[in-house]
Amino acid sequence: MASVFSRMSAMSLLLGLVACGAPIVNNTDPIQSKGVKVVTTFLPITLFTEAVAGDCADVTALIPPNLGPHDFQATPSDLTDLSGANVLVKNGLGMEEFLDDLISSADNKDLVVIDSSTGVKTIKAAGGGHHDDHHDDHHADEHHDHGHGHSHGEYDPHIWLDPVRAAQQVENIRDGLVKADPSCADGYKNNADQFTAKLNELNTEFTAKLKPYNGKTFVAFHDFATYFANRYGLKAEFLVDLPEMNPSPADLQRVAAQVKNSGLKALLTEPQEGNRSFNALAKDLGVNIVEFNPLETGSAESAKVPGTYFEVMRSNVNNLVKAIGD
């Protein structure tokens, strides 16, 4: 994958733009006009923002729904979208490592940036196929994005897969939109209340459904499920850190041993990944492949329906139960 710096340098030459390199300071002045234009980064952030915005704002995804943040390469039209936007909503925690350069090139001094991870309790990222089974006492507003190259940084960014943390993200989006566009404050608040209530119900449902499997281990293709696993008393293992990485022989041996020791009936694959090595490993071990969708990608239609989150997450839990077995 080309580096973010290389991609943005090439784009800057193409457009005749020069990135200023200065830190981005979020504008905090309220937007006075109607027709607020909100740009989101990738699928879960788009779903959460659509839920909160309702009829109050127009929401546009920066990354096409069929692409994940790892595969995104900015185009001139992306600069145009950011240049004309009032608000940008991101996941944070290094998930969108391309953003700083892109925002600088867009040169939109009035752009309000909402980091949905602010204040969310984080877990340190860990290579080598596992995480510690505890929560680190850090919150997302205590550090900056650390994404460089093929790494998300110090902290795991996949907070949206935990419904409790997802509710915090929704609240951050609500607060940011209310501050940016107070003319529709009641709408943002009511919409957010309804969505967070559903997230809380989902958490209650999952807690009951997964309680019999407390302490069980599951194996996913890439490192995305730690927050989810920690929420429900499970242990998450993974083959590779990032979806575009190729597993080493040591990775395959480690996962094979874990599958044999845990009695897993299936490995968890992802809809957007070919995972040929994962499929071959499952065949060698005599286990099945089932899908756990990390919601990094989806269809254009699903991205406009906030209920997609609940549908996919329920499917994930059903498949997870199949993978863990009795």
Spans of features found by a protein language model:
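Bacterial N-terminal signal peptides
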Residues: 9-19
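Bacterial N-terminal signal peptides that target proteins for export
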Residues: 1-10
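Extracytoplasmic metal-acquisition and chelation regions
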Residues: 3, 20-326
